Amino acid sequence: MKVWLFSDLHLEFADLRQPRTIPDADVCVVAGDLCRAPANGVHWLGKNVAHAMPCIYVAGNHEFYKGSIKEGLEDGRAAAAQFPNVHFLENDFVMIDGVRFLGATLWTDYRIEGHPDLAMVYARERMNDHKLIAEQRNPWKRFVPETAFRMHQESRLFLTSVLKADPIKTVVVTHHLPHAKSIPSRFEGDLLNAAFASDLSEVIEVGRPALWLHGHTHDTCDYRVGSTRILCNPRGYGDENIAFDPALVVGV
């Protein structure tokens, strides 16, 4: 199977009315931060890509800016129901041609730099996620690091349990980073890394998915943990990432 991977197009800042190219692939995977609001991302994929291949889409943090997670997920699922070829996943999976795709935003556990309590305080002060995102609209609740931690734990449990249940060929798609090797070297030691990445080494090594595809960082990466290949192919803001390949296709 050939998988077309990209993330972090950030259409809310630099509009692309349609992809510059649609490569020869069997499945399109979008690892978050496509645009503002999950439903808008679903509609963009339904209009521009789904005619060519099935689409796997997970929300990034920016999908929820100036909105809420609860209602955003509900709206994304409702929109995806209109497009049989667009699969919007949050702690959910879909089978395509014998390959299982697991999807979740993932968020973080704030532990990767070794000071989770301090990292949560730092994230609350520094991350726009906790200024521009609500957990829910009615009744209104702010999205706080404690909620991100809880949601991360829920996603980690989902991924672990499904990977253990049946060892079939699997692709995991998350927005947040699953391993420290995905953190760009220029940010080494930065406490804010804990709001971007978590160490899921055990999940990866025990579950052994064929691929783990993610976004969030605006730096390309491609490496292995055990038998699992981990990739990120983000565009970033405008043409921020010069290594971005809009037609990247990987095999599974």
What residues fall within each predicted segment?
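A basic- and aromatic-enriched beta-loop-alpha substructure that forms the phosphate/nucleotide-
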Residues: 56-122
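Beta-strand-turn-beta hairpins that frame and shape the catalytic cleft
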Residues: 1-4, 93-103, 224-229
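Glycine-rich phosphate-binding loop signature in dinucleotide/nucleotide-binding domains
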Residues: 22-23, 96, 162-168, 206
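Binuclear metal-dependent phosphoesterase catalytic core
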Residues: 81, 184, 190-210, 218-252
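Active-site neighborhood of phospho(di)ester-bond hydrolases with catalytic His/Asp-centered motifs
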Residues: 5-7, 28-33, 56-61, 87-91, ...
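Active-site environment of divalent metal-dependent phosphoester hydrolases
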Residues: 10-16, 36-40, 62-73, 93-95, ...
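Active-site-proximal loop/helix segment associated with metal-binding centers of metalloenzymes
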Residues: 102-171, 178-187
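N-terminal active-site segment of His-dependent metallophosphoesterases
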Residues: 1-58, 64-73, 135-138, 142-145
